[in-house]
Amino acid sequence: MKIRPLHDRVIVKRKEVESKSAGGIVLTGSAAGKSTRGEVLAVGNGRILESGDVKPLDVKVGDVVIFSEGYGAKTEKIDNQEVLIISESDILAIVEA
């Protein structure tokens, strides 16, 4: 299924990150918590400004981002994979290699 977010929305697939406890024990499943890193799968056209102009988004498809799951984050299942639909303002940083 192809999905295209509207306006300043971004579709992110959560990246699995290995978590370790303070004692060095590898945590898995619910003990590890959910990652706040993900890969951008799709982006909207941009934020509509008061002037009516559209400001393009700073993130692009393929970027790895660190995000905050704000109150507006929506979890969806698309093609048997869980994705998040968030606003660009919920993205805190782009991870550069």
Curated annotation (Swiss-Prot):
<keyword id="KW-0963">Cytoplasm</keyword>
<keyword id="KW-0143">Chaperone</keyword>
<comment type="subunit">
    <text>Heptamer of 7 subunits arranged in a ring. Interacts with the chaperonin GroEL.</text>
</comment>
<dbReference type="InterPro" id="IPR037124">
    <property type="entry name" value="Chaperonin_GroES_sf"/>
</dbReference>
<dbReference type="GO" id="GO:0051082">
    <property type="term" value="F:unfolded protein binding"/>
</dbReference>
<comment type="similarity">
    <text>Belongs to the GroES chaperonin family.</text>
</comment>
<dbReference type="InterPro" id="IPR020818">
    <property type="entry name" value="Chaperonin_GroES"/>
</dbReference>
<dbReference type="GO" id="GO:0051085">
    <property type="term" value="P:chaperone cofactor-dependent protein refolding"/>
</dbReference>
<dbReference type="GO" id="GO:0005737">
    <property type="term" value="C:cytoplasm"/>
</dbReference>
<dbReference type="InterPro" id="IPR018369">
    <property type="entry name" value="Chaprnonin_Cpn10_CS"/>
</dbReference>
<dbReference type="GO" id="GO:0051087">
    <property type="term" value="F:protein-folding chaperone binding"/>
</dbReference>
<dbReference type="GO" id="GO:0046872">
    <property type="term" value="F:metal ion binding"/>
</dbReference>
<dbReference type="Pfam" id="PF00166">
    <property type="entry name" value="Cpn10"/>
</dbReference>
<dbReference type="GO" id="GO:0005524">
    <property type="term" value="F:ATP binding"/>
</dbReference>
<dbReference type="InterPro" id="IPR011032">
    <property type="entry name" value="GroES-like_sf"/>
</dbReference>
<protein>
    <recommendedName>
        <fullName>Co-chaperonin GroES</fullName>
    </recommendedName>
</protein>
<dbReference type="GO" id="GO:0044183">
    <property type="term" value="F:protein folding chaperone"/>
</dbReference>
<comment type="function">
    <text>Together with the chaperonin GroEL, plays an essential role in assisting protein folding. The GroEL-GroES system forms a nano-cage that allows encapsulation of the non-native substrate proteins and provides a physical environment optimized to promote and accelerate protein folding. GroES binds to the apical surface of the GroEL ring, thereby capping the opening of the GroEL channel.</text>
</comment>
